[in-house]
Amino acid sequence: MNTEIAKLLDSNFLTYLLEGKNIDENDGNLIERLTDLLTLINDDSVELVITPLLRYEFLRKFGQNESEDFNKFRAAVEEFTWLDISKDVTDLATNLYRLDKHEADSKGIPKNLEKRKFDVFHFATAKINGIELLSNDKHIDQMEDLYERYQAL
């Protein structure tokens, strides 16, 4: 494959792509992005990638008694190209988490940072590798703003 562009799929996009579930048909922006994703799948210059953490996040939802689905989707995710989570990624994710926590604490804003602990890794992976993160998580834009504040430090 002659890849020119890579795109990192978040677990929600893996779910949309592989299972066709959780698609809000009233969300015009999501439908447009999924239509674009289908175009990307057929584009030989684009490679869709995941990380071991995304694999874990996607596959952990299949219960012990769902072996057939688990095995089917485990085989499907094995077909993606993998990006390792490097030290640079963990450093960036750690620093973004620390800054986010500091800002929330200093403003007295309660924030569920634990809910975002995987997403900050996905975001950092995309940033370190210079690729786009395809996600439907609403707080990714907030992470982009946080990243810009971190860069300005």
Where are these regions (language model features)?
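Short beta->alpha linker loops
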Residues: L53, I85-D88, K138
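A generic structural signal for short hydrophobic patches within well-formed alpha-helices
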Residues: L14, R55-F58, I140-D141
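Short acidic-hydrophobic, aromatic-tinged amphipathic segments that line or gate anion-handling sites
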Residues: T81-S86, R149-L153
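Acidic, PIN/NYN-like endoribonuclease modules and their adjacent C-terminal/linker elements
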Residues: M1-A6, N26, L40, F123-L153
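Short, well-structured N-terminal submotif of metal-dependent ribonuclease cores
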Residues: M1-I50, R60-R74
